[in-house]
């Protein structure tokens, strides 16, 4: 399946298509969108976003704890969409 992922960036909103087996960060890059990242392995917080609507699978990440995920935080480098969703990007500072 392919889902529509709406990214709310500091400079505006854009909607991309993302396959259920594709990380959101990779799909954004394929669409020419520059999102922050560092490790690309789900082990740091550089690419943090907040899921505002929809559902995601981020079982590949190892950085966020259950409380942070319950608040909607996700690491876009290791997050797959499981529905159409909306994600606010550039949210690393909100984690701490």
Swiss-Prot record:
Presence of keyword Flavoprotein: no
Cysteine disulfide links: none
Cofactor, free-text remark: Binds 1 [2Fe-2S] cluster.
NCBIfam families from the UniProt entry: fdx_plant
Gene3D superfamilies: 3.10.20.30
Principal localisation: plastid
Family stated for the protein in its record: Belongs to the 2Fe2S plant-type ferredoxin family.
Record keywords: 2Fe-2S, Chloroplast, Electron transport, Iron, Iron-sulfur, Metal-binding, Plastid, Transport
Superkingdom field: Eukaryota
Domain 2Fe-2S ferredoxin-type: 3-93
Gene Ontology biological process: electron transport chain
Cofactor annotation: [2Fe-2S] cluster
Binding, [2Fe-2S] cluster: 39, 44, 47, 77
Full protein name: Ferredoxin
Annotated transmembrane regions: none
Places the protein is found: Plastid, Chloroplast
One Pfam family, short name: Fer2
Highest classification ranks of the organism: Eukaryota, Discoba, Euglenozoa, Euglenida, Spirocuta
Entry GO terms, CC: chloroplast
Role played: Ferredoxins are iron-sulfur proteins that transfer electrons in a wide variety of metabolic reactions.
Alphabetized GO MF terms: 2 iron, 2 sulfur cluster binding; electron transfer activity; metal ion binding
């Amino acid at each position: 399946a392919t889902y529509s992922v709406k990214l709310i960036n500091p400079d505006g909103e854009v909607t991309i298509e993302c396959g259920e087996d594709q990380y959101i960060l990779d799909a954004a890059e394929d669409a020419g969108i520059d999102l922050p990242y560092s490790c690309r392995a789900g082990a740091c917080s550089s690419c943090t976003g907040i899921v505002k609507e929809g559902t995601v699978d981020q079982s590949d990440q190892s950085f966020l704890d259950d409380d942070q995920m319950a608040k909607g935080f996700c690491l876009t480098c290791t997050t797959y969409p499981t529905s159409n969703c909306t994600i606010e990007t550039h949210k690393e500072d909100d984690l701490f």
